[in-house]
Amino acid sequence: MPHPYPALTPEQKKELADIAHRIVAPGKGILAADESTGSIAKRLQSIGTENTEENRRFYRQLLLTADDRVNPCIGGVILFHETLYQKADDGRPFPQVIKSKGGVVGIKVDKGVVPLAGTNGETTTQGLDGLSERCAQYKKDGADFAKWRCVLKIGEHTPSSLAIMENANVLARYASICQQNGIVPIVEPEILPDGDHDLKRCQYVTEKVLAAVYKALSDHHVYLEGTLLKPNMVTPGHACTQKFSNEEIAMATVTALRRTVPPAVPGVTFLSGGQSEEEASINLNAINKCPLLKPWALTFSYGRALQASALKAWGGKKENLKAAQEEYIKRALANSLACQGKYTPSGQSGAAASESLFISNHAY
């Protein structure tokens, strides 16, 4: 067994751990506002709004400048490259706006999924080339954490061991590079909800994928206390005819995490995976009420599940700004309660709260 070559100094480790804990402080989660230009185009199209840089800026500003009621709810915001360099109407750069509200600035650093030859339509994620230099620059420009998404599909013969291994290794390489540059990596191995598989199959696959991810992180000497995990919840496939309760989903999810995620990891920030706004909050609440020992913060890193009602209320019209912000605040407050196991569904909900946000074969 070789001797360890220290990858990080004690000071570097402390900085990373502190950042990670700030993001997942009690009651806090993450706003994922890192949709690529192509993805935000679909959101804007859904409300009949043109995909211009100004519309994108205005919409992100709407979310980032919601009043102080969101401050105790949002520990971090993930931005797309373009957004990191945009400014609010008052001239403040967006990172400054986020920090002034007590949030940590995050940046999406992957370059999207690409086909993995020799597999049945499986993918890996590109973007390792030049990543160290980009991280160094992003750190200077105010970002303290990053996100990298890998995607796996459940099918008769998927995910293959090749896809699991390759994606685990690419996540570990990314995480290691981020930490060298003072950036906390969010590790996102998303298992898509496409398919007719049941809850048990999703749980089994989730366990295998997470076990591989943490083995790779160990092999690459990644400092776990300075990372976060962004997994899917364990849910049945969208085409599964059998219905499962929120408690069953919570139990399967927490069981899978307990079997695979070391307690050194400070927090698990679930992706919403096309669940409706309300469903994402109810499931997160059930996960936090699950009667098993949970050594990590279990919170949210939601995109559509925080934004859908706000987007609809805005409708691309400046005069709807306040109404849209109210919808966003409503979801932020709901999820802040849910990550503490204190959410009671109100029945009254936002403009799009119960609409399914599922997109088949979702690519950002």
From Swiss-Prot:
Q: What are the GO MF terms of this UniProt record?
A: cytoskeletal protein binding; fructose binding; fructose-bisphosphate aldolase activity; identical protein binding
Q: Which residues carry this modification: N6-malonyllysine?
A: 111, 312
Give residues where Phosphotyrosine occurs.
Answer: 5
BP term (GO), one: ATP biosynthetic process
Question: Which residues are modified to Phosphothreonine?
Answer: 9
Q: Where is this site: Necessary for preference for fructose 1,6-bisphosphate over fructose 1-phosphate?
A: 364
Q: Does the keyword Acetylation apply?
A: yes
Locate residues linked as Glycyl lysine isopeptide (Lys-Gly) (interchain with G-Cter in SUMO1).
42
Q: Which transformation does this protein catalyse, written as a reaction? A: beta-D-fructose 1,6-bisphosphate = D-glyceraldehyde 3-phosphate + dihydroxyacetone phosphate
Q: Where are residues bearing N6-acetyllysine located in the sequence? A: 42, 108, 111, 330
Q: Which CDD domains match?
A: FBP_aldolase_I_a
Q: List the disulfide bonds.
A: none
GO cellular component, alphabetical, reads: actin cytoskeleton; cytoplasm; cytosol; extracellular exosome; heterochromatin; I band; M band; sperm head
Q: Which residues form the active site?
A: 188 (proton acceptor), 230 (schiff-base intermediate with dihydroxyacetone-p)
Q: Where on the chain is Phosphoserine found, per UniProt?
A: 36, 39, 46, 132, 272
> Any further remarks?
In vertebrates, three forms of this ubiquitous glycolytic enzyme are found, aldolase A in muscle, aldolase B in liver and aldolase C in brain.
Return the similarity comment.
Belongs to the class I fructose-bisphosphate aldolase family.
Tell me what this protein is called: Fructose-bisphosphate aldolase A
The uppermost taxa in this organism's lineage are: Eukaryota, Metazoa, Chordata, Craniata, Vertebrata
Please name the gene that encodes this protein: Aldoa
